[in-house]
């Protein structure tokens, strides 16, 4: 993406995603936000188009594209009018499974990733805790080895999106006490396993917005998982987690720009159509100048997001 211009291939990606999103109008998204109905039809359409696997490896059924292309996809979704209801519905599929795809055993990778890409499996990501938000190393969820093999996980997570419909869950838990490791980031492990509702309870959290995609408090009580559920090496989970969380920050930035552009477009249309004292209100500087400033700030934010995407991809490529 030299000079922040999209290549022909990237333009084609954006156009294709926009065509898919055009099938879901404002009434569709308004209804979901009013009733809390998850946008299943939208997710199915994006899965059929192959967009859930945008950044996943080709050998696992993905497109093998980079963060820039994933950023284009997610911005197009948000800008279409789907906003964060649409973006959040598929957001986790884009980079959330990357720790599994990159560090999981060969059997786990080949079992899990194709089913996530196709939409057959619906995963949620259990990271944040009531007393451990950005400070992930302070989490208290524990995974302990069972004498006969496997692990038992206990703990509480919060703000876990999609847990009401998930059949799979990616959990980060402490496997070595914090006081027993050299660095706080050590001793944390990742597990990808079934969402066993006899051992995991998900309680929806009331929110002011984005009602179509619920957030949950998750309670994990003696969840037994096999050794095969461990992603990569024991104690390295925090570092693996960053392969999903860091690029996600870029996606969120681009999604926010997309949502801002959609809002600005509606405001500009209204300013043109609303006539007061014989002329559109957009001809008044008190209306036009704030809209112009909003446009400039959105463009600056967009440049930042699309500068971060290739920079991250370049740094990540050099790290492996």
What residues fall within each predicted segment?
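Short Ser/Thr-interspersed hydrophobic loop/turn segments at strand-loop and sheet-helix junctions
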Residues: 50, 73-78, 173-175, 193-198, ...
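Alpha-helical interface subdomain recognition
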Residues: 1-81, 90, 103-108, 115, ...
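Glycine-rich phosphate/pyrophosphate-binding beta-alpha loops
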Residues: 132-133, 158-163, 247-251
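A short core secondary-structure module
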Residues: 150-203
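Long, acidic (Asp/Glu-rich), low-complexity accessory segments flanking structured domains
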Residues: 222-240
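A short, Trp-centered hydrophobic/proline-enriched beta-strand micro-motif
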Residues: 119-127, 172
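Cytochrome P450 C-terminal beta-domain/meander region
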Residues: 135-154
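Flexible, small-/acidic-enriched active-site or ligand-binding loops
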Residues: 138-140, 196-226
């Amino acid at each position: 993406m030299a000079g922040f211009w999209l290549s022909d291939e990237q333009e084609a990606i954006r156009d294709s995603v926009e065509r898919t999103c055009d099938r879901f109008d404002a009434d569709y998204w308004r209804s979901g936000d009013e009733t809390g109905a998850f946008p299943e039809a939208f997710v199915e359409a994006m899965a059929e188009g192959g967009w859930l696997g945008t950044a996943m490896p080709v050998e696992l059924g993905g497109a093998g594209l980079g963060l820039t292309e994933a950023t284009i996809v997610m911005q197009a979704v948000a800008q279409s009018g789907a906003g964060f209801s649409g973006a959040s519905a598929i957001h986790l599929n884009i980079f959330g499974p990357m720790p599994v795809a990159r560090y999981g055993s060969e059997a786990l990778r080949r079992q899990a990733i194709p089913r996530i890409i196709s939409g057959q499996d619906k995963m949620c990501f259990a990271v944040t805790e009531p007393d451990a938000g950005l400070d992930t190393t302070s989490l208290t969820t524990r995974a302990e080895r069972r004498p006969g093999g496997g692990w038992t996980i206990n703990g509480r997570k919060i703000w876990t999106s999609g847990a009401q419909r998930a059949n799979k869950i990616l959990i980060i838990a402490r496997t070595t006490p914090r006081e027993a490791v050299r660095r706080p980031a050590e001793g944390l492990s990742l597990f990808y396993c079934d969402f066993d509702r006899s051992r995991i309870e998900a309680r929806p959290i009331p929110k002011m917005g984005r009602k179509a995609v619920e957030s949950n408090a998750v309670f994990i009580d003696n969840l037994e998982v096999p050794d095969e559920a461990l992603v990569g090496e024991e104690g390295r989970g925090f570092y693996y987690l960053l392969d999903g969380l860091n690029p996600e920050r870029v996606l969120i930035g681009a999604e926010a720009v997309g949502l801002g552009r959609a809002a600005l477009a509606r405001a500009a249309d209204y300013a043109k159509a609303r006539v007061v004292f014989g002329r559109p209100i957009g001809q008044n500087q008190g209306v036009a100048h704030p809209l112009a400033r909003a446009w400039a700030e959105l463009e600056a934010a967009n440049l930042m997001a699309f500068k971060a995407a290739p920079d991250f991809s370049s740094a990540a490529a050099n790290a492996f």
